[in-house]
Curated annotation (Swiss-Prot):
The gene is hutI. Pathway: Amino-acid degradation; L-histidine degradation into L-glutamate; N-formimidoyl-L-glutamate from L-histidine: step 3/3. GO terms for cellular component: cytoplasm. It comes from Micrococcus luteus (strain ATCC 4698 / DSM 20030 / JCM 1464 / CCM 169 / CCUG 5858 / IAM 1056 / NBRC 3333 / NCIMB 9278 / NCTC 2665 / VKM Ac-2230). Fe(3+) binds at residues 65, 67, 225. Its EC number is 3.5.2.7. Belongs to the metallo-dependent hydrolases superfamily. HutI family. 4-imidazolone-5-propanoate binds at residues 74, 132, 164, 228, 317. This is Imidazolonepropionase. One of its GO terms (molecular function) is imidazolonepropionase activity. Transmembrane segments: none annotated. SUPFAM superfamilies: Composite domain of metallo-dependent hydrolases, Metallo-dependent hydrolases.
């Protein structure tokens, strides 16, 4: 067991239950775990010593919502959207066609590159989804690929999103027969979660229930895309199924907020203990890219609901892995404090993946996921938006950047 002392930390944001922010601090890492946290002057000896020279350190980002398995380019579609023009050649179908045509090696190379970009920006725990295959064979291929990358430690959580969209030329109910039958059977050993896009133009409440029920029966956890396009049944279905998270949440009724808040009655936010409810996943980069209303993170937090921030990296509506950007946006545009935004991008994401006992905060015994900023304090994430502030990253105890 080899130990490393990371010291000379100007500001250490722990996101622990006390919300401690330490100054002149140090962390000791043993193998892949945190072994000690405290004042630098009291730090124990270690095999190796790394000085961060007066920089700030916080937990690595937990990106709880991404779509990394894709090929193709949709920049013309984005340009048209920014100009307020229609673009008939766009949409998920474009990505599906390009992704189906790509070889396994090509897709693996693309995913590796996107993960590398994410880690270079401070992300240390990643969820990603299938959903650009939309046939039994392709969804199974993408799930196998992601499971292999998970074994390598490149991604951490794999989600089955066969119910992303009804493919062109398919009847919705006929397609769902595939999703809950042979498609689910082919991916269940590779995925930990089932997801559905429950919204206008995708799947309605009953269709969503059908997929989620099948996923639960197959042993998968539940997450959901909901209430992105308009206020609808997504949040209600997520609560009904005890989903770990419902993501997008741009359009919420008072009843939606009340329902989400009701799932958190067994959770004590101050001590970060108890039974977590359904996390409200906010995706600000996507909201900006689609010129949608920003998700009401302030309203959700004030109602007692845990919120996550995630990149939603995908080729159509949020082609970025930058969690720094999302955190800065949450402070500048969504009325979160820095502490709230950092918590949402770390512990909030971990709660939405039910991984809060392993990651999401800097505490003894947790995975050593550290993000060192090229700045003396974490507020620089919002104070200096768009700047390349990631200086170093430890992921599971190993220096990754």
């Amino acid at each position: 067991m080899r130990s490393t002392l990371i010291t000379d930390i100007a500001e250490l944001t722990t996101v622990d239950p006390e919300g401690r922010v330490l100054t002149d601090a140090a962390v000791v890492v043993e193998d892949e775990r945190i072994a000690w946290i405290g004042p630098a002057a009291d730090a124990p000896d270690a095999d190796d010593r790394v000085s961060v020279e007066g920089r700030a350190v916080l937990p690595g980002w937990v990106d709880s919502h991404t779509h990394l398995v894709f090929d193709g380019d949709r920049s013309a579609e984005f340009e048209a959207r920014m100009a307020g023009e229609s673009y008939a050649a766009g949409g998920i179908g474009v990505t599906t066609s390009a992704t189906r045509a790509a070889s396994d090696d090509r897709l693996a190379e693309l995913v590796r590159g996107r993960v590398a970009d994410a880690v270079a920006g401070g992300t240390t725990y990643l969820e990603t989804k299938t959903g650009y295959g939309l046939t039994v064979e392709e969804e199974a291929r993408h799930a196998r690929l992601l499971a292999g990358l998970r074994e390598e430690g490149l991604v951490d959580e794999v989600t089955f999103l066969g119910a992303h969209l009804v493919p062109p030329g398919r009847d919705a109910e006929d397609y769902l027969d595939d999703v809950v039958g042979p498609m689910l059977e082919a991916v269940r050993e590779h995925a930990g979660w089932v997801d559905v896009f429950c919204d206008t133009g995708a799947f309605d409440a009953e269709q969503t229930r059908r997929v989620l029920a099948a996923g639960v029966a197959a042993g998968l956890g539940v997450r959901l895309h909901g209430n992105q396009i308009e206020q609808g049944p997504g949040v209600g279905v997520a609560v009904e199924f005890g989903a770990a998270s419902v993501d997008h949440v741009n359009h919420l009724s008072d009843a939606d907020v009340e329902a989400l808040a009701g799932t958190w009655t067994g959770w004590d936010r101050a001590s970060a203990t108890g039974t977590p409810g359904t996390v409200a996943g906010c995706l600000p980069a996507c909201d900006l890219s689609t010129r949608a209303p920003l998700a009401p993170a302030r309203r959700l937090l004030d109602a007692g609901i845990e919120v996550s921030l995630a990149s939603n990296c995908n080729p159509g509506t949020s082609y970025t892995t930058s969690m720094n950007f999302n955190v800065g946006t949450a402070v500048l545009q969504m009325h979160l404090t820095l502490a709230e935004a950092v918590r949402a991008a770390t512990l909030g994401g971990a709660l939405g993946l039910r991984a809060q006992d392993r990651v999401g905060s800097l505490e003894v015994g947790k995975r050593a996921d550290l993000h060192v900023l090229d700045a003396p304090a974490a507020i620089h994430l919002a104070y200096r938006p768009g700047m390349p502030l990631t200086h170093a990253v430890w992921r599971a105890g190993r220096r990754a950047v």
